[in-house]
Swiss-Prot record:
Keyword Cell wall biogenesis/degradation appears in the UniProt entry: no
Protein name: Adenylyl-sulfate kinase
NCBIfam families attached to this UniProt entry: apsK, PRK03846.1
Function: Catalyzes the synthesis of activated sulfate.
EC number assigned by the record: 2.7.1.25
Enzyme class: transferase
Record-linked InterPro entries: APS_kinase, P-loop_NTPase
Organismal lineage: Bacteria, Bacillati, Bacillota, Bacilli, Lactobacillales
A Gene Ontology biological process term: hydrogen sulfide biosynthetic process
Pathway note: Sulfur metabolism; hydrogen sulfide biosynthesis; sulfite from sulfate: step 2/3
CDD domains listed in its UniProt record: APSK (cd02027)
Gene behind the chain: cysC
Catalysis: reaction(s): adenosine 5'-phosphosulfate + ATP = 3'-phosphoadenylyl sulfate + ADP + H(+)
């Protein structure tokens, strides 16, 4: 691929701070990482709904959804996984610049890839949420039957079976969905956002 050097970044006349002021909340990336079936997407979508109910601008970037469009040309090799996360990191950065709280739900198995996304954002704009649900619990859920296929050898390079998952060393938030209900997990994330002054919230949505 030939890369062009004849490009220039064009600054907007509206700053990120001005967008945040208009929205009455800070923008940040909530990066949900964990094994398939750990509960990343479920929690991320529930948090988004809770934020929406309190008039907080937010959006979920889901791992499966992104592979329908932007990342449809990527597979699951180490190189493709790295590019997958790089692209999502760049999209998430644009969402943050737009003043939106951005929730990403990706296995993102490699620590270095997640760290690159963090480094590409401001210090307080990346919150790593480790959904630390045990492998056996994830396998018991296995709604998509992916673990079963991986165990039978029908899928190769599957994270947690024959491909590694590098757990975060010092995540901002750790959640084990095998030990608490969804409402508690959502409240845990909302509490973090409120306590660190990203948003002003009343309570989590328990519907």
């Amino acid at each position: 691929m030939v890369k062009s050097d004849n490009i220039t970044w064009h600054q907007s006349q509206v700053s990120k701070a001005e967008r945040q002021a208009l929205n009455h909340h800070k923008s940040v990336v909530l990066w949900f990482t964990g094994l398939s079936g750990s509960g990343k997407s479920t929690i991320a979508n529930a948090v988004e709904k809770a934020l929406f109910d309190q008039q907080v601008g937010s959006y979920v970037l889901d791992g499966d959804n992104m592979r329908f469009g932007l990342n449809k040309n990527l597979g699951f090799s180490a190189e493709d996984r790295e590019e997958n996360i790089r692209r999502i990191g760049e999209v998430a950065k644009l969402f943050v610049d737009a003043g939106v709280i951005t929730l990403t739900a990706f296995i993102s198995p490699y620590r270095a890839d997640r760290d690159k996304v963090r480094a590409n954002l401001e210090v307080d704009e990346f919150i790593e949420v480790f959904v630390d649900t045990p492998l056996e619990v994830c396998e018991q859920r296995d709604v998509k039957q992916l673990y079963a296929k991986a165990r039978r050898g029908e899928i190769t390079g599957f994270t947690g079976i024959d491909a590694p998952y590098e757990a975060p060393i010092d995540p901002e938030i750790t959640i084990d969905t095998s030990k608490q209900p969804l409402t508690a997990s959502v409240q845990q994330v909302l509490n973090y956002l409120a306590e660190h002054h990203y948003v002003s919230l009343v309570t989590a949505n328990e519907n």
